[in-house]
A protein has these predicted regions:
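Conserved, mostly hydrophobic/aromatic
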Residues: 3, 47, 51, 59, ...
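Hydrophobic faces of well-ordered beta-strands that scaffold small-molecule active sites
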Residues: 3-7, 55-57, 87-89, 117-121, ...
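Internal, glycine-rich beta/alpha segment that forms the wall or movable "lid"
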Residues: 12-15, 26, 95-202, 217, ...
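Active-site mouth loops of central-metabolism enzymes
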Residues: 21-38, 92-100, 180-191, 245-248, ...
Length: 359
């Protein structure tokens, strides 16, 4: 099993930081922002020394919760100063982006350091659509069309036109093209049946996130079924599971931390009236359960315990989900104590990581 660290930027919030979304930019401190980006590089070096395989980034807007509105820029920043560790961009958010620009920027990264970057194509959540004034009901179709266009732009050696429902280009011919063939290491991200179908049809990996092991096993099971129908079999490294983890020196320490979270609110929740307006009506998992956006609550914990219990839980995830890459956050993005998180990362690197390599 490979292990990735989910890097959020970790802007240092304080008691005066507004707890709402969007967070007014008047609260932004330029010195704190610069410090946060320097710390991203320091953490990348730290987790690399601990033996982590990847560091991952994700696109979010209008909040200090995750300070990476442009994953390609963040990836280039880390890659220019830290050697070796792979960098996973999970996503960009496809429906909120210009697909040609995404294809070009990711191709640039792959050309600069071939094989070092991993790309995930993401549909995103409803509040992110509001950032760029998009209709949430169109997100699924915009995502599929945008991903189709990105893949074709990477692969097509001759100029072509594109006249889709959401994107129209008279001529597409990107420079540079990715040096890897048939494409860079790429995943479709999401637990929906549509995400699994797209990934299977295009021979892509699948990235799932934040659901229970049982629910994620349904999603990856459906993905493998669809892959079989398209005549290929995904391996463990074709499945990424992003998740939150509470790791303690003992089970009791971790359980106490979990108990404290039960009444916690998300660090920057969407206002209730906005939340009701932004429920993504077609976001359903492969088991048919409605999954509205996680609004006003902290994200769920997938793994909790001391090192021995967490090792057992990770083995269970490997067996049930078939996951080959686990992408972990040891505290909720944007909350918690950074110093304590670094201590838990070191504990994970010393007491957990060596025991899951063979899983």
């Amino acid at each position: 099993m490979k292990v990735s660290f989910f890097e959020t930027g970790r802007y240092p919030v304080n008691s005066d930081t507004p707890r709402e979304w969007p967070v007014p930019s008047a609260a932004y401190d330029p010195e704190a922002g610069a410090k946060a980006y320097r710390a991203m590089v320091e953490r990348a070096r730290f987790v690399q020394k601990l033996g982590f395989d990847w560091i991952s980034l994700s696109e979010h807007h209008y909040s200090p919760r995750i300070l990476t509105p442009s994953p390609p820029l963040s990836a280039a920043h880390i890659a220019s100063q830290v050697d070796g560790i792979k960098i996973a961009l999970l996503g960009p958010i496809v429906p909120a982006s210009n697909p040609i620009r995404v294809a070009e920027e990711l191709a640039m990264l792959d050309t600069m350091q071939p094989g070092r970057f991993v790309f995930g194509l993401l549909r995103g959540t409803t509040n992110e659509y509001l950032s760029y004034d998009l209709n949430p009901k169109e997100a699924r179709e915009r995502t599929d069309e945008g991903m189709e266009l990105i893949l074709k732009a990477w692969a097509e050696p001759q100029p072509f036109g594109w006249q889709g429902r959401y994107f129209q280009y008279r001529t597409v011919s990107i420079w540079p093209r990715p040096p890897q063939s048939p494409r860079p290491e790429t995943y479709a991200l999401g637990v929906s049946a549509e995400a699994s179908e797209f990934a299977a049809r295009h021979h892509l990996g699948l990235g799932v996130s934040y659901g229970s092991i049982d629910l994620m096993a349904q999603a990856t099971g459906y993905y493998r079924e669809r892959c079989a129908e398209y005549g290929w079999e995904p391996g463990p490294d074709d499945i990424i599971y992003r998740c939150n983890m509470i790791l303690g020196e003992t089970d009791e320490e971790a359980d106490a931390a979990l108990e404290r979270r039960k009444s916690a609110q998300a660090p920057f929740p969407i206002a209730a009236n906005l939340a009701r307006a932004l429920i993504d009506q077609d976001r359903r998992n492969v088991g048919g359960e409605a999954r509205p956006a996680n609004v006003g609550r902290v994200l769920p914990i997938s793994f909790c315990g001391g090192p021995e219990r967490v090792i057992k839980q990770l083995r269970q995830a490997r067996e049930q989900i078939g996951v080959g890459v686990v992408d972990i956050s040891l505290t909720d993005p944007g909350s918690g104590d950074t110093g304590a998180m670094m201590e838990k990362l070191e504990l994970f690197g010393k007491k957990v990581l060596p025991h899951i390599r063979e899983v």
